[in-house]
A protein has these predicted regions:
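Short, low-complexity N-terminal tether/leader segments at secretion or assembly junctions of large
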Residues: 1-25
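Extended recognition patches within non-cytosolic domains
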Residues: 22-25, 230-231, 271-295, 326-370, ...
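Extracellular glycan-interaction surfaces
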Residues: 372-400, 420-430, 446-506, 522
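Extracellular glycan-recognition modules
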Residues: 400-458, 489, 526, 540-547, ...
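Extracellular glycan-interaction patches encoded by glycine-rich segments
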Residues: 460-467, 510-533
């Protein structure tokens, strides 16, 4: 036995006589199975559950807890703190105990799709082969599910959702019971599944909030609420409403990909509380299917292969063309940022309505959707930003060596917002040098550019200019640029706006202007001492927070040895997994040569790779599925000679490390937010109410216009509601409603919704204005159930 922090952890390996640590404290890469019929794998880290995994010790008396040791059950009673769940279309579902370094089987469900009426968790067929997820004691596999906290299981259906008789102890020999509480889903073919805990979630067995489940089906997306209500989003994009690759972000937003010939990523900012065929809040188009929205993602003519939520409201999207990393701007999704990564280039973050993204793996190529390819005059040197780094650097500019583009209306920004950003390194900036200029060859006032006249730099937009305070003449890489926003021109200086900015209202549109990089448009003032990288020009002005985030993400790429590309030359992404505990994104790829099958990123930097063929008798390098959690990774190869491999962290003792802190907010309040365009009344908060229950609800609601304080409001709402058995939710007493707003038509109010079993907060903004709403809600109730998390 090993004791750490007064807790004892089981060990299957005896320490040697010399007192050295057992294998339990050492890194290990182990084969789980050699089967190539594994359809899905999932690492379930119970420390990420709402109670930090404490529910595992409260299950005494449930049918599964004290099962005897057998071929389908280990001798250990409690659910593992860290579990590996493997769904095999031939052998069923196996849960492995990763608290034990020997990785023993903990429980087996041996049901397949043909056993739907006698066994839980079918592991084959479209009904069960679509996605695997676990949260708060629930394991979800396609349409099928089991709940270890309430000791029950069932399946979803378009017309007859069912629950099984008996408990999980009867999993391999049960019968169908009556209908479950859940409504009908959109289609019985399930392609993926995900779950989250929303604000105000009902409390279920063992004090755990009940997850809200999202199912991506062949007929759209179904959102299954804890109450049993199911709402379907069936929006058709160019004749297709099939969905796959679904996930929730940290704020309750829901994202999924279309599955047909035209490929799109769709996003709902707020939970679905009504069946709808209307367009969601945001559609992210791919480069192969250009539409009217931005930013764009890398895509192919085949469906998006994998997607994963990353920190905050960001997400990763993989396709046959590579990887896209998105930082969503929840105030205005059209102003989100995206990076494109493949085996040739890393574009850096492209903001909103991007018009050019170059000097990334090529002197002339434009990595943006606009394809504004540059021309090279003379010879511009291509190198790397630092020794053994992968990011490209471009230098050797002179009067006869430069990059350019003929007039293009994409850069005629008029008097509106726009931005230019890139990275520069100077050995000496003495004398005047143009890093970039867009103007006529003879020179006009309708121009924009960036000029160094010594250690500092100057930015131009029309007739206005602003001088930086940043010293770029120090031999280091710096992020610089210009931003015009809200009628002011600013310098960009290593992740920050310049100190004050200057008024800027003149036009930069010019029907004869050309773009030169590395010199002025008349051929003078060449940037002979500069190296440039990651040039981006956009019709969108990034916010100060976005600039800071982009700087922090890109800066590591300019260090010696920094890697930032995918390993596979064919760029195809098979699977994605993000580990919140380590902030690492793992990309599984199709591999055509002897290179690692998985590339691992921290932000934009590649920090590790994994080669399954090095550790097992795999016949190839491709990895088809991946899951990560708690520092543990599992890789699966489903072709040729393959199988599933587990990569354990160097410090085991996972049962100790994986009992996490409670995720329940300590302020006792529910928190909601939404960004809404226009004056349409919209519900932004959903507070469940049970029958035979009275509740006192107090809410502070704030509103601010996105990008400034033009429109703003504050409301304080206090009311008492009740719902009798079999009755409607009714207002008992409106105690007070206080409000202050810049426009009288703005509204925030409570609204009871009996069919949904909830009190909602309805807000109304201002026509043509993007308003960001936030609500902090306190609920006091007398009930058999508590809903506060």
């Amino acid at each position: 036995m090993i004791t750490i922090n007064k807790k004892t952890v089981r060990s299957t390996v005896t320490p040697s006589a010399g007192g050295t640590q057992s294998n339990e404290l050492q890194a290990a890469i182990k084969s789980v199975t050699s089967s190539t019929t594994v359809g899905a794998v999932f690492l379930y880290d119970t420390s990420a559950d709402s109670d930090g995994g404490k529910w595992r010790s409260k299950c005494k008396g449930l049918s599964w807890f004290d099962e005897a040791s057998s071929t389908t059950r280990s001798a250990r009673s409690e659910f593992p703190a860290m579990a590996l769940i493997v769904a095999d279309s031939v052998s069923g579902v196996t849960i492995y105990d990763l608290d034990d370094p020997a990785m023993p089987m903990w429980m087996v469900f041996n049901g397949l799709s043909g056993n739907y009426d006698t066994k839980m968790l079918w592991a084959s067929g479209n009904a069960a082969g679509g996605g695997l997820f676990a949260l708060n004691g629930r394991v979800l596999l396609g349409r099928t599910w089991v709940d270890f906290s309430s000791d029950e299981g069932g399946y979803h259906h378009t017309s007859a959702p069912k629950i099984y008789t008996g408990g999980i102890g009867d999993r391999n020999g049960t019968t169908l019971g009556g209908s479950s509480i859940y409504g009908a889903i959109a289609d019985n073919t399930v392609n993926d599944i995900s779950a989250t805990i929303l604000e105000g979630a009902e409390i279920g067995a063992l004090g755990l909030p009940i997850p809200t489940v999202a199912v991506a089906t062949a007929g759209g997306v179904s959102v299954i609420h804890p109450s049993g209500d199911v709402y379907n989003q069936t929006h058709t994009v160019y004749g297709n409403n099939q969905a796959n690759s679904i996930f929730w972000d940290d704020k309750g937003g829901l994202s999924w990909a279309s599955r047909g010939g035209n490929i799109y990523n769709l996003h709902l900012s707020n939970p679905l509380y009504a069946t709808s065929s209307a367009a969601p809040d945001k559609i992210f188009y791919t480069l192969n299917n250009v539409g009217s929205y931005f930013p764009y993602l890398l895509g192919g003519t085949t469906p998006i292969t994998a997607r994963a939520g990353i920190s905050g409201e960001g997400f990763a999207s993989g396709s046959s063309n590579g990887l896209s990393l998105v930082k969503q701007n929840t105030g205005n999704l059209e102003e989100s940022a995206v990076t494109h990564i493949n085996s040739t280039y890393n574009s850096g973050y492209q903001i909103g309505d991007i018009r050019f993204a170059g000097l990334a793996g090529s002197r002339t190529a434009d990595r943006s959707v606009k394809a504004n390819t540059l021309a090279m005059t003379g010879s511009v040197t291509a190198g790397v930003v630092a020794t053994d780094a992968e990011l490209g650097a471009y230098s050797g500019f002179s009067a006869t060596d430069y990059l350019s583009q003929a007039h293009d209306a994409d850069f005629d920004f008029g008097t509106t917002d726009f931005s230019v950003m890139f990275w520069v390194k100077y050995s000496s900036a003495s004398g005047g040098e143009y890093l970039l200029k867009r103007d006529t060859t003879g020179g006009t006032s309708n121009k924009f550019g960036i000029y160094t006249g010594g250690s500092n730099f100057t930015v131009y937009a029309g007739t206005e200019s602003d001088l930086s305070a940043l010293d770029v003449d120090d031999g280091s890489w710096h992020q610089i640029g210009l931003v015009r926003t809200g009628g002011k021109l600013y310098t960009l200086e290593d992740g920050k706006y310049g100190a004050s900015g200057v008024a800027s209202v003149s036009t930069v549109s010019n029907g004869s202007a050309v773009l030169h990089i590395g010199q002025s448009t008349d051929g003078t003032s060449p940037a002979t001492n500069a190296s440039l990288s990651l040039l981006r020009i956009s019709k969108t002005a990034p916010s100060p927070k976005q600039i800071a985030d982009i700087y922090a993400a890109e800066k590591p790429l300019f260090q010696a040895g920094a890697k930032c590309l995918l390993q596979s030359g064919n760029n195809a992404v098979n699977g994605l997994a993000y580990d919140k505990s380590t902030s690492l994104l793992t990309v599984a790829q199709n591999i055509t040569s002897a290179v690692p099958g998985a590339t691992i990123f921290r932000g934009l930097e590649q920090v590790a790779t994994f080669d399954g063929k090095d550790y097992d008798a795999w016949s190839g390098y491709s990895i088809h599925d991946v899951s990560t959690a708690g520092g543990v990774s599992v890789y699966s190869r489903q072709a040729g000679t393959g199988g599933t491999i587990l990569d354990l962290p160097a410090l085991d003792v996972r049962a100790e490390l994986n009992e996490g802190e409670s995720k329940i907010p300590d302020d006792g309040k529910l928190h909601f937010s939404a960004s809404i365009l226009g004056a349409t009344a919209t519900n932004i908060a959903h507070i469940p109410v049970n029958e035979n229950e009275a509740v006192f609800v107090s809410a502070n609601v704030r509103a601010n216009e996105y990008g400034g304080n033009g429109e703003r409001a504050f409301y304080q709402l206090k009311s008492i509601y009740r719902q009798d058995i079999g009755g409607n939710i009714v207002l008992d007493d409106e105690i007070s409603t206080l409000g202050s707003e810049t426009t009288a038509s703005m509204v925030a109010k409570f609204d009871s919704n009996t069919p949904k079993g909830a009190i909602e907060i309805e807000v109304t903004g201002v026509a043509l204005k993007q308003i960001v709403w936030t609500a902090s809600v306190e609920v006091q109730r007398i009930s058999e159930k508590l809903y506060e998390r």
